[in-house]
Amino acid sequence: MIRVAINGFGRIGRNFARCWLGRENSNIELVAVNDTSDPRTNAHLLKYDSMLGKLKNVDITADDNSITVNGKTIKCVSDRNPENLPWKEWEIDLIIESTGVFTSKEGALKHVNAGAKKVLITAPGKNEDGTFVIGVNHHDYDHNVHHIISNASCTTNCLAPIAKVLNDKFGIIKGSMTTTHSYTGDQRLLDASHRDLRRARAAAINIVPTSTGAAKAVALVIPELKGKLNGVALRVPTPNVSMVDFVVQVEKRTITEEVNQALKDASEGPLKGILDYSELQLVSSDYQGTDASSIVDASLTLVMGNDLVKVMAWYDNEWGYSQRVLDLAELVAEKWV
């Protein structure tokens, strides 16, 4: 059992906490939360969620310094500088770094300077010791080497399992990805200044093209795809659940049925629970609360000229991603000596 603290109790921080509360036989103990908001507000937002609904069968209370969940006290602190946090005093082993601010190794090491032993960044990292996508390269995690780690992005977690299947089975020559992505907290509700002029526009009434490093980041977990993938994002007026549109040129000639069979076999075998496969005629809201990283929509798979393959897949960019953060934290806990 390792002692864990969450830094940043926003969408991913709270989703992670809910995932942990629902996980039986967890090897981690949630000990503390650092957030700029006060414990009572955070307790309220944990219990009542516009996407997930009310947290049922859980008793949540709060005071000035803590949140209590079913009798278990989670200490709360509020400091924007990680080096000031009481991680040494509270004997914290692992930080779930979900502020979106301290994503570089230099930034994450501030938690280590404060006494934590390891940091798991819930975003693409910079100069981190390793990036891991569960189901793709998690077996490469080395407890003695990887201290500042990244769980990549929600989109990379959706894309990488599909890329792995297609590359292993057919060989990827090159490809591109478009993610139709729900709006996030990094956009403006109404037109207002932003470093990205498109993200400056009202999120709930616009389709907002923007950049994403998700496709390039696949090479961090599947090195043979380095330089072969790129992509863009379209932020759309939905609050959650996104969709990847992945187009690749492959070495081995194939047909639609063969591509779908390869994806289905993976979903029932080595990638079970990570990659799902659906032939149902569903829409985005149907996938709210889905645990899998990626759900292939088989009816949308296309093959042109036997070598151009298009696969589309849904993902819950909050809940599904947070489940993988918890999975990676559990992996770290299992390797702890």
Curated annotation (Swiss-Prot):
It comes from Trichormus variabilis (strain ATCC 29413 / PCC 7937). This is Glyceraldehyde-3-phosphate dehydrogenase 2. It is found in: Cytoplasm. The record marks H181 as: Activates thiol group during catalysis. SUPFAM superfamilies: Glyceraldehyde-3-phosphate dehydrogenase-like, C-terminal domain, NAD(P)-binding Rossmann-fold domains. Signal peptide: none annotated. Pathway: Carbohydrate biosynthesis; Calvin cycle. It catalyses: D-glyceraldehyde 3-phosphate + phosphate + NADP(+) = (2R)-3-phospho-glyceroyl phosphate + NADPH + H(+); D-glyceraldehyde 3-phosphate + phosphate + NAD(+) = (2R)-3-phospho-glyceroyl phosphate + NADH + H(+). Its EC number is 1.2.1.59. The lineage of its organism: Bacteria, Bacillati, Cyanobacteriota, Cyanophyceae, Nostocales. Gap2 has a major role in carbon fixation as a component of the Calvin cycle. Catalyzes the oxidative phosphorylation of glyceraldehyde 3-phosphate (G3P) to 1,3-bisphosphoglycerate (BPG) using the cofactor NAD. The first reaction step involves the formation of a hemiacetal intermediate between G3P and a cysteine residue, and this hemiacetal intermediate is then oxidized to a thioester, with concomitant reduction of NAD to NADH. The reduced NADH is then exchanged with the second NAD, and the thioester is attacked by a nucleophilic inorganic phosphate to produce BPG. Belongs to the glyceraldehyde-3-phosphate dehydrogenase family. NADP(+) binds at R11, I12, D35, R80, T122, N317. GO terms for biological process: glucose metabolic process; reductive pentose-phosphate cycle.
